[in-house]
Amino acid sequence: MDYSAALDQAIGKLHEEGRYRTFIDIERRKGAYPQAVWTRPDGTETRITVWCGNDYLGMGQHPVVLAAMHEALDATGAGSGGTRNISGTTVYHKRLEAELSDLHGKEAALVFSSAYIANDATLSTLRKLFPGLIIYSDELNHASMIEGIKRFDGAKRIFRHNDVAHLRELLAADDPEAPKLIAFESIYSMDGDFGPIKAICDLADEFNALTYLDEVHAVGMYGPRGGGVAERDGLSHRIDIFNGTLGKAFGVFGGYIAASARMVDAIRSYAPGFIFTTSLPPAVAAGAAASIAFLKTAEGQLLRDQQQLNARILKMRLRGLGMPIMDHGSHIVPVHVGNPVHCKALSDMLLADFGIYVQPINFPTVPRGTERLRFTPSPVHDPKQIDHLVKAMDSLWSQCKLNRSTSAA
């Protein structure tokens, strides 16, 4: 076999379909977010505004977070020095897990190197804990959940997105004595729509199923203390296992689960993705704990309120220009383009001509024909930056002769 030719063919196919991913070289500057510096391919630097970042609230540069990280770095050095089982558990890791369990009203929490690993490791391990377990998964669950469920050596059922009636049919068709788990999300990041948490919890109660809720795009963002959509809706006590990230609203790095002490102890003891990997650096754990604690306060609520206001303003202004907004009421602002080449071209022109960075979202992240630009306004985007973005989108939409409409489903 000609291995080089096979690789060239695989990459060439992505180029032909307009979905080859390019990395934009940007450098965030302390105290200036959402502004950053883009280093062009020729080495020149251009000041830009980031409109697609996951640092939803700007906590990655908050003084409280940076101070905690500096203190831990000066006290302990760079790395943790080992796995959690072998010299890699510190007071900073324990403090972080205490903040997380408190955030979700659970007995315990467990920190992983990322939310992807937390999902993959936890979901793939559950068969060891519950022989005969059947997992019911929303068809639009994140790739990390899908991978974990694929590696789960047990029965799997996929229900149509947010379709509670279909989920009921699947649950009712299986052995009532079989252990069951329903895996779903509170906010689906590509469309920005909410999962029907209460309705799924009602079904879980009826069919004696565990609930597994991914709140990656909601923790820090919703609820009076940033505990996510389940906290906002008063449903945290009905969720058996939470998954979340430390790298979005909390602005740092890492992932976690929160659950009962028994559940966390079992995952800690059986999940290879937790056991056989170096733990988070103490400075990262310290920064994440400080961020979580801050976002539980009234000051944290002010950031959430401003972020929601900015998201509403951006949606209103883009919709007023006929942009096909996909608005499900969350903080995420997707604009439907529907063509990978156009989507990439819009992204490139926004960056090169207007200093606006938003990454195109193409297949396989979203289905073919639903390609989009996905904006994530933060509380630190100011009115001038919003105005500049709206005018740029208006100009390029006309230049590219794209259709305008009042809404998009």
From Swiss-Prot:
Alphabetized UniProt keyword annotations: Acyltransferase, Heme biosynthesis, Pyridoxal phosphate, Transferase
E.C. number: 2.3.1.37
Gene Ontology molecular function: 5-aminolevulinate synthase activity; pyridoxal phosphate binding
Obligatory cofactor(s): pyridoxal 5'-phosphate
Subunit structure: Homodimer.
Family, per entry: Belongs to the class-II pyridoxal-phosphate-dependent aminotransferase family.
Name listed for the protein in its UniProt record: 5-aminolevulinate synthase
Pfam family name, one: Aminotran_1_2
SUPFAM superfamilies per record: PLP-dependent transferases
GO biological process, one term: protoporphyrinogen IX biosynthetic process
Native species: Paracoccus denitrificans (strain Pd 1222)
Catalytic activity annotation: succinyl-CoA + glycine + H(+) = 5-aminolevulinate + CO2 + CoA
Chain positions recorded as pyridoxal 5'-phosphate binding sites: S189, H217, T245, T277, T278
Modified residues (N6-(pyridoxal phosphate)lysine): K248
Pathway the protein contributes to: Porphyrin-containing compound metabolism; protoporphyrin-IX biosynthesis; 5-aminolevulinate from glycine: step 1/1
The keyword Transferase belongs to this UniProt entry's keyword annotation: yes
Gene3D superfamilies: Aspartate Aminotransferase, domain 1, Type I PLP-dependent aspartate aminotransferase-like (Major domain)
Catalytic residues of the enzyme: K248
Taxonomic superkingdom: Bacteria
Binding-site positions, substrate: R21, S137, K156, T365
Key word Disulfide bond present: no
